[in-house]
């Protein structure tokens, strides 16, 4: 019995079949599984510009494997293009829109399974949220990573262009050099090339078994990526037959495996937010504290940008995520019995993967010689973040900083101050009212952090925010501060010049103001007026949960 029988079987469904005949169904097709192809193709961004070819390959393969594919579109927002603008407020919102769209199309048409094709950052968690909500057989196809740009013998990514802006304002480069970086940073199709958010989330999905082995690190423009899309469709047909569903795979152990891999590869802070959201939707008891627990035992073994030397295609050439997983598995750092969409256990999947990283490469290190002995995503708490905050500490030379607060009510005000050279070594920059409710939309702060790095202050200044950071951010940065300012969090009580301690060693984020003074400030605090009362941002601000619970919109806190 298929779910799609609800629209294809029986005399009463003759009108339904009439419409299906108009889109290509014949007599022999009724009774085949109807498979949604959720296509994120868009010319908005290089991340998604190649997705149509992958979706068509998957569509063809699904039909040849005995399914009836039905393609439909979903949206994307380009984080890189909207970064530093009001448009960035729509980025995290788009995760919910993508999830809602896929759920609506698949459930509205009684589809038997779904293959989602995505590229830019929110495509991955958006698709995963939909898959967890629907719990129908599902496979994710990642659009692939962009190849590195080249300039003067150096690899470039889009983050190189953001940092070049700071280098220009500090006099390190001129406009000719800035333009050269701009023209060479993004050479073609694919998602941003370091271990930024898109590649982090695709690695997590591969680890959790909802995409195929090696698929998360393939280059977008290589033929093996198209072949992988076709194979993914074949696997989906088999998953429908075997009734393998997302909630069979998305167990607590699978999430722990994903966190372990994210730590090992040096992945994005956004993975914390997205995995919390997916777990909540899947009914899995995952908390922000689980990330810290796993961080303590899993080292960083991949030397990847933004803080390292290499890009994701280099990781692929060194063995990809399966090689990383095999090293962790052999060390007892992964749950070996987790299943994949192909019906295999993780142990079975990795049986033929070498137990040592390939010789002659420095992208993946052995666990005996890690880049960092512990994971790089630290969970900081204190009176500034009673529900927690997320710090990315890989490559940080100064993990402890106590300094005066420089308070900004928006990203724009902060960036202007940095570019005007008003931020000095030792400052603790506070950007607030950028959280899920306050922004709304929890913008990423890549422009300010890149400007700080570009001016040579990356190891000398801390930045904390109730907003987010791009996967391309590095330095002493602390995001996802919860509770956020807009709902009464302590970050909203900070005043210019207050002493703040950021201590990544002791996992502390503390406002050094006595409790009596904090109580006085809190008594005088009033909830700010919403920045938007209508439209999708107004709706989002009314519905969204705390970042410490994934910033979802379909669960009441």
UniProtKB/Swiss-Prot annotation:
Keywords in alphabetical order: 2Fe-2S, Amino-acid biosynthesis, Branched-chain amino acid biosynthesis, Iron, Iron-sulfur, Lyase, Magnesium, Metal-binding
Stated role: Functions in the biosynthesis of branched-chain amino acids. Catalyzes the dehydration of (2R,3R)-2,3-dihydroxy-3-methylpentanoate (2,3-dihydroxy-3-methylvalerate) into 2-oxo-3-methylpentanoate (2-oxo-3-methylvalerate) and of (2R)-2,3-dihydroxy-3-methylbutanoate (2,3-dihydroxyisovalerate) into 2-oxo-3-methylbutanoate (2-oxoisovalerate), the penultimate precursor to L-isoleucine and L-valine, respectively.
InterPro entries: DHAD_IlvD/Edd (IPR050165), Dihydro-acid_dehy_C (IPR042096), DihydroxyA_deHydtase (IPR004404), DiOHA_6PGluconate_deHydtase_CS (IPR020558), ILV_EDD_C (IPR056740), ILV_EDD_N (IPR000581), IlvD/EDD_N (IPR037237)
Cofactor, how bound (note): Binds 1 [2Fe-2S] cluster per subunit. This cluster acts as a Lewis acid cofactor.
EC identifiers of the protein: 4.2.1.9
Binding residue positions for Mg(2+): 79, 121-122, 444
Pathway participation: Amino-acid biosynthesis; L-isoleucine biosynthesis; L-isoleucine from 2-oxobutanoate: step 3/4; Amino-acid biosynthesis; L-valine biosynthesis; L-valine from pyruvate: step 3/4
Molecular function per GO: 2 iron, 2 sulfur cluster binding; dihydroxy-acid dehydratase activity; magnesium ion binding
Any single GO BP term: isoleucine biosynthetic process
Residues annotated as the enzyme's active site: 470 (proton acceptor)
Pfam families named in the record: ILV_EDD_C, ILVD_EDD_N
Name of the protein: Dihydroxy-acid dehydratase
């Amino acid at each position: 019995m298929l779910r799609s029988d609800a629209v294809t079987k029986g005399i009463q469904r003759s009108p339904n079949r009439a419409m299906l005949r108009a889109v290509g169904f014949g007599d022999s097709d009724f009774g085949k599984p109807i498979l949604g192809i959720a296509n994120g193709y868009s010319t908005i961004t290089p991340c998604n510009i190649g997705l149509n070819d992958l979706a068509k390959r998957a569509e063809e393969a699904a039909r040849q494997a005995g399914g009836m594919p039905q393609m439909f579109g979903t949206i994307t927002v380009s984080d890189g293009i909207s970064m530093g603008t009001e448009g960035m407020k729509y980025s995290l919102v788009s995760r919910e829109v993508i999830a809602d769209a896929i759920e609506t199309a698949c459930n509205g048409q009684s589809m038997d399974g779904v293959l989602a094709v995505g590229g830019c950052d929110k495509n991955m968690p958006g698709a995963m949220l939909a898959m967890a909500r629907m719990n129908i057989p599902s496979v994710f196809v990642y659009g692939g990573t962009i190849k590195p740009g080249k300039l003067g013998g150096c690899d470039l990514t889009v983050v190189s262009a953001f940092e070049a802006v700071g280098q220009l304002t500090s006099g390190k480069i001129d406009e000719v050099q800035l333009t050269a970086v701009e023209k060479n940073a993004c050479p073609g199709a694919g998602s941003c090339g370091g271990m930024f958010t898109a590649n982090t989330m695709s690695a997590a999905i591969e680890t959790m078994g909802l995409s195929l082995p090696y698929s998360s690190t393939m280059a977008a423009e290589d033929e093996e990526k198209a072949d992988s899309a076709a194979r993914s469709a074949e696997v989906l047909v088999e998953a429908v037959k075997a009734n393998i569903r997302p909630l069979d795979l998305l167990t607590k152990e699978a999430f722990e495996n994903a966190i372990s891999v994210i730590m090992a590869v040096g992945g994005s802070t956004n993975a914390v937010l997205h995995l919390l959201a997916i777990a909540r939707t899947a009914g899995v008891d995952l908390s922000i504290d689980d990330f810290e627990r796993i961080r303590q035992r899993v080292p960083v073994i991949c030397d990847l940008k933004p803080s390292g030397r290499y890009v994701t295609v280099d990781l692929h050439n060194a063995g990809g995520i399966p090689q990383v997983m095999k090293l962790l598995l052999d060390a007892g750092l992964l749950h070996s019995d987790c299943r994949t969409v192909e019906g295999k256990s993780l142990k079975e999947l990795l049986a033929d993967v070498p137990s040592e990283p390939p010789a002659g490469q420095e992208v993946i290190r052995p666990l005996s010689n890690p880049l960092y002995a512990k994971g790089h995503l630290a969970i900081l708490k204190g009176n500034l973040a009673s529900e927690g905050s997320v710090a990315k500490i890989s490559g940080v030379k100064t993990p402890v900083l106590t300094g005066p607060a420089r308070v900004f009510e928006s990203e724009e005000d902060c960036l202007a101050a940095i570019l005007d050279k008003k931020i000095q070594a030792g400052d603790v920059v506070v950007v607030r009212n950028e959280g899920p409710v306050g922004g709304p939309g929890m913008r990423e702060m890549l422009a300010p952090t890149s400007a700080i790095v570009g001016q040579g202050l990356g190891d000398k200044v801390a930045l904390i925010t109730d907003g987010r950071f791009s996967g391309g951010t590095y330095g002493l940065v602390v995001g996802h501060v919860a509770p956020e300012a807009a709902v009464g969090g302590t970050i909203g009580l900070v005043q210019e010049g207050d002493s703040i301690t950021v201590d990544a060693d002791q996992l502390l984020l503390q406002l050094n103001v006595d409790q009596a003074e904090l109580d006085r400030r809190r008594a005088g605090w009033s909830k700010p007026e919403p920045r938007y009362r209508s439209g999708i941002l107004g709706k989002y601000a009314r519905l969204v949960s705390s970042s410490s619970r994934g910033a979802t919109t379909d669960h009441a806190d």
